[in-house]
């Protein structure tokens, strides 16, 4: 059944004060990598707190198709990996559904194997460019046997007999490209080097070291990172407790800031500094966000967040902050809609190649609901209305349903918006929220949100 046939609209209405304690699902980036590295490592890997959304499950299914043994026992996932260099050729195509991270990282992981692998995805993923990952793989000797024009899925790869290590400078701020090259380096003799001018989320580096990879990072005087990985070493299974996803935490967090009288606590949130751009920006806007019980879990910083309703003010978000909050701009734009003055977001070119053209999807949704905003090539300026006065769907019969374009973050962001606008906000489809945050509806309504 297609997404279109199964579309489930949803409407959010002005809510009473939100209150209570919530725990968001496990971090998506760490969950994908836990399945991948556990499936590749020798011995047993045990994972608690894994995000059981559709995207991560697709990565798990791909690893199983290549020889890993993965099962759930109670609240824990137990994996017996193949050993580095010992993945098997899958019998059929690897279907990644909507999972951009899973597909791009797996292309890196298996691309340097002397075997044929085909990658397919849903309509949204099949429209996303994969050339940025295929380009360094081609340099390592990987053949792209089949691809849809524009390096889009379906894509069939065949690795070389012996892959060549490369030094690759990542041309854009992309953790996915960096990670794909490092993972390709795992099955490549010698040392593969990635040069990263702008630091992006560093879960791949941290976790590979935890699994025993010979990986080192040097930062030069200009702040450029050089990441070295020695191929064909042994990876050993680990025990992983996945912290809460800061991108998912952004939704209840912004909801509490904009719904008057709210006071909530979000527990066990990942506080890795490459992921806290939204938190920092909302604090600069005047958001009352207290960081409680900061602690270290499995090499990552974790904390609880107490969030209270706040009168927000517009700010200019520095463009260099974009990599640390690239997935959070839609919900930041919602917060900005209730702030006094203008919020300017720049350096957003990566939003054009996400699950949807996320920048235009946000701008169109805001305008439909009465928000004064200006969309640039790589920027968005939002002029807010404190209290949400006059915002929300127009009652005069015009269809103001927000088109989510099969994008889970657009869907959740606009449902958050409707909790504080004068009039309700409706989205065309909530079905794809399950890709990253299956518990979203239950968690939000449990805090008091009016969403149906």
UniProtKB/Swiss-Prot annotation:
GO terms for cellular component: cytoplasm. GO terms for molecular function: 3-phosphoshikimate 1-carboxyvinyltransferase activity. 3-phosphoshikimate binds at residues 28-29, 33, 174, 176, 327, 354. The active site is at 327 (proton acceptor). Pfam families: EPSP_synthase. It is found in: Cytoplasm. GO terms for biological process: amino acid biosynthetic process; aromatic amino acid family biosynthetic process; chorismate biosynthetic process. Transmembrane segments: none annotated. CDD domains: EPSP_synthase. It catalyses: 3-phosphoshikimate + phosphoenolpyruvate = 5-O-(1-carboxyvinyl)-3-phosphoshikimate + phosphate. Residues 1-26 are annotated as: Disordered. Phosphoenolpyruvate binds at residues 28, 100, 128, 176, 358, 409. The keyword Cytoplasm applies. Residues 1-17 have a biased composition (Low complexity). Monomer. Belongs to the EPSP synthase family. NCBIfam families: aroA. This is 3-phosphoshikimate 1-carboxyvinyltransferase.
């Amino acid at each position: 059944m297609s997404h279109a046939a199964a579309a489930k609209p949803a409407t959010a209405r002005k809510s009473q004060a939100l209150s209570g304690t919530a725990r968001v699902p496990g971090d998506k980036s760490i969950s994908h990598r836990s399945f991948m590295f556990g499936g590749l490592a020798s011995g047993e890997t045990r994972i608690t707190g894994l995000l059981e959304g559709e995207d991560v499950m697709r990565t798990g299914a791909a690893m199983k198709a290549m020889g890993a043994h993965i099962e759930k026992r109670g609240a824990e996932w137990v994996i017996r990996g193949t050993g580095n260099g010992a993945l098997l050729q899958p019998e059929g195509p690897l279907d990644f559904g909507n999972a951009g991270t899973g597909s791009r990282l797996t292309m890196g992981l298996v691309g340097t194997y002397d075997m044929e692998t085909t990658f397919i995805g849903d309509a949204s993923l099949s429209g996303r460019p994969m050339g940025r990952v295929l380009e360094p793989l081609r340099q390592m000797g990987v053949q792209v046997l089949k691809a849809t024009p524009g390096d889009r899925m379906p894509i069939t790869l065949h690795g070389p007999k012996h892959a060549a290590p490369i030094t690759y400078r990542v041309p854009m701020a992309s953790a996915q490209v960096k990670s794909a090259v490092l993972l390709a380096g795992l099955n490549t003799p010698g040392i593969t080097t990635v040069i990263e001018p702008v630091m992006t989320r560093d879960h791949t580096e941290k976790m590979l070291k935890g699994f025993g990879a010979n990986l080192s990072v040097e930062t030069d005087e200009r702040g450029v990172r050089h990441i070295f990985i020695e191929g064909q070493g042994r990876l050993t299974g680990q025990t992983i407790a996945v912290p809460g996803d800061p991108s998912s935490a952004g939704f209840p967090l912004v909801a509490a800031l904009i719904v008057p009288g709210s006071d909530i606590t979000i527990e066990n949130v990942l506080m890795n500094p490459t992921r806290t751009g939204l938190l920092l920006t909302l604090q600069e806007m005047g958001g009352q966000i207290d960081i409680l019980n900061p602690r270290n879990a499995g090499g990552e910083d974790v904390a609880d967040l107490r969030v209270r309703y706040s009168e927000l003010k517009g700010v200019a978000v520095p463009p260099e902050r974009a990599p640390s909050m690239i997935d959070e701009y839609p919900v930041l734009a919602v917060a900005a809609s209730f702030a006094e003055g203008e919020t300017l977001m720049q350096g957003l070119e990566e939003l054009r190649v996400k699950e949807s053209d996320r920048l235009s999807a946000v701008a169109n949704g805001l305008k439909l609901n009465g928000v004064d905003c200006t969309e640039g090539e790589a920027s968005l300026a939002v002029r807010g209305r404190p209290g949400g006065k006059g915002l929300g769907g127009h009652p005069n019969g015009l269809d103001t349903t927000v088109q989510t374009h099969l994008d889970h973050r657009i869907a959740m962001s606009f449902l958050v918006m409707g909790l504080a606008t004068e009039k309700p906000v409706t989205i065309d489809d909530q079905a794809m929220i399950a890709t990253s945050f299956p518990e979203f509806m239950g968690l939000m309504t449990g805090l008091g949100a009016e969403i149906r």
